[in-house]
Design a protein with these regions (language model features):
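Glycine- (often His-adjacent) and acidic-residue-rich active-site loop
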Residues: 71-123, 173
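Well-ordered beta-strand positions
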Residues: 155, 195, 199-201, 207, ...
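Intrinsically disordered, low-complexity segments enriched in small/flexible residues
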Residues: 1-12, 262, 270, 275, ...
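C-terminal long alpha-helix characteristic of the crotonase
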Residues: 78, 158-163, 175, 214-261, ...
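Conserved CoA-thioester-binding segment of acyl-CoA-metabolizing enzymes
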Residues: 1-77
Length: 298
């Protein structure tokens, strides 16, 4: 999946070390890419901080409708490709993943409350609740926490030649009992989801597609072009409709939080009606409200 730099402009508001962040020149799409190919794009706390920052920036940029999450490559060690291989096990402590001295400076005092966090879960929630389409573009390995990350995205495109899906949580005494497993079961069924976690086998892009957890299998060389074409199509849609559709899809699985998000957006839409304006104006003008001209729709 060659990165076609001529199609993108770097977002220079940030100084990321573990990610690259670009915006498409001809559409409202951003590309957030893990940039640790030498370790299969495994994430450390700094990586997750940067990912959250980039996603939040994309969320609050009003002319961006689609967010692509992918992984840079290939690895300088063996030429392999990866989306993300989950948490870097070398820095996992007894209560989570640790910031390294080099990440914050050996002399800088660390806030103890930041230590030992599983804040990749905060990233999952941001992806889930973001009122925009988040698309995983998987050029290679999607493993462990990286597998869960693609699961929580709205769509997944996968490299025909290099994508591998694998859940290693039980092998390293970890488990994602939230979106990474329960939402996966909604996609592929309970039996297949349990197989994926309990056995930890490798699945090709085609096998993942056949199960229902991948939207399209794409030749590796075409992956970025296809992702941009999908993004272009989605960016041409009504932003309000896309937002409400995402929240509607999510609501059945997200309990009262999902209901609140959907209802909040519905309330905001209602504020734009003449009926809502009559309610507001009658209050401000201190007169009796008159909703008689508004029908009880059926």
């Amino acid at each position: 999946m060659p990165f076609r730099s001529e199609l993108w402009t770097e977002v220079k508001d940030f100084k990321f070390q573990d990610l690259t962040y670009h915006r498409a020149k001809e559409q409202g799409t951003v590309r957030i890419a893990f940039n640790r190919p030498e370790v299969r794009n495994a994430f450390r706390p700094q990586t997750v901080d940067e990912l959250f920052t980039a996603l939040e920036h994309a969320r609050t940029t009003p002319d961006v409708g689609v967010v692509i999450i992918t992984g840079n490559g290939p690895s300088p060690k063996d030429g392999g490709w990866a989306f993300c291989s989950g948490g870097d096990q070398r820095i996992r402590g007894k209560d989570g993943y640790k910031y390294e001295n080099s990440e914050r400076g050996a002399t800088q005092k660390m806030d103890l409350a930041r230590l030992g966090r599983l804040h990749i879960l905060e990233v999952q929630r941001l992806i889930r609740f973001m009122p925009k389409v988040v698309m995983a573009v998987v050029p290679g390995w999607a493993v462990g926490g990286g597998h869960s990350l693609h699961v929580v995205c709205d769509l997944t495109l996968a490299s025909e030649e290099h994508a591998v899906f694998k859940q290693t949580d039980p092998d390293v005494a970890s488990f994602d009992s939230g979106y990474g497993s329960a939402y996966l079961a909604k996609m592929v069924g309970q039996k297949r989801a349990r197989e994926i976690f309990f056995l930890g086998r490798n699945y090709s892009a085609q096998e993942a597609f056949d199960m229902g957890m991948v939207n399209a299998v794409v030749p590796h060389a075409d992956l970025e072009n296809v992702a941009l074409e999908w993004a272009r199509e989605m960016n041409s849609k009504s932003p309000t409709a896309m937002r409400m559709l995402k929240y509607g899809f999510n609501m059945v699985d997200d309990g009262l939080v999902g209901q609140q998000l959907f209802a909040g957006e519905a309330t905001r839409l209602a504020y734009g009606t003449e009926e809502a304006q009559e309610g507001r104006d009658s209050f401000l003008e201190k007169r009796p409200k008159n909703f008689s001209k508004f029908p009880w729709h059926y």
